[in-house]
């Protein structure tokens, strides 16, 4: 089975930047590309009632184990990314964070002031953008 990290690295490469001027939902048809990929994965995982609605929302049901009376749990996330920076041709990088400034490229860096809590991840492997695009991590995780 594919690891969560491998899936995530694949998900962030989908071009899902929103377009605030279309007046549609989703704001771009390409956002449904990720939705269709997620549907295939949910079906492969044997979830039931897998479908995408007209707004691009992907829904599926994971029933309780046989003989178990348990409530249904919903997992909800949006798939679009902000238009603040490009979301096309995302090139995620794996880096070991050693503390302090984390240079993404010659002109873009992450700092603990910009990213509160970054200091809690010293010594850990982080998935970051190359600084030319948004990663879309909050959307596609």
How should each PLM-predicted stretch be described?
Residues 18-24, 60, 85, 89, ...:
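Generic marker of "main functional regions" within proteins
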Residues 12, 16-19, 42, 46, ...:
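Structural signal for hydrophobic packing residues in well-ordered secondary-structure cores
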Residues 1-3, 61-62:
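Short amphipathic alpha-helices and their capping/turn segments at secondary-structure boundaries
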Residues 2-29, 127-129:
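N-terminal capping segment at the start of a domain
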Residues 23-76, 80, 93-95:
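A non-catalytic alpha/beta surface segment that caps or lines the substrate-entry region
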Residues 69-141:
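Active-site metal-coordination/substrate-binding segment of hydrolases
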């Amino acid at each position: 089975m594919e690891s969560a990290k491998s899936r995530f690295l694949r998900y962030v490469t989908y071009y899902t930047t929103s377009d605030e001027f279309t007046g549609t939902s989703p704001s771009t048809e390409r956002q449904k590309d990720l939705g269709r990929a997620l549907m295939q994965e949910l079906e492969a995982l044997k979830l039931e009632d897998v479908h995408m609605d007209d707004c691009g929302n992907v829904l599926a049901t994971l029933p309780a184990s046989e003989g178990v009376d348990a409530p249904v749990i919903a997992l909800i996330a949006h798939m679009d990314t902000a238009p603040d920076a490009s979301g096309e041709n995302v090139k995620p990088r794996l880096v070991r964070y050693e503390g302090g400034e984390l240079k993404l490229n010659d002109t873009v860096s992450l700092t603990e002031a910009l990213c509160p809590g970054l200091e809690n991840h010293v010594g850990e492997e982080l998935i970051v953008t190359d600084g030319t695009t948004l990663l879309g991590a909050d959307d596609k995780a």
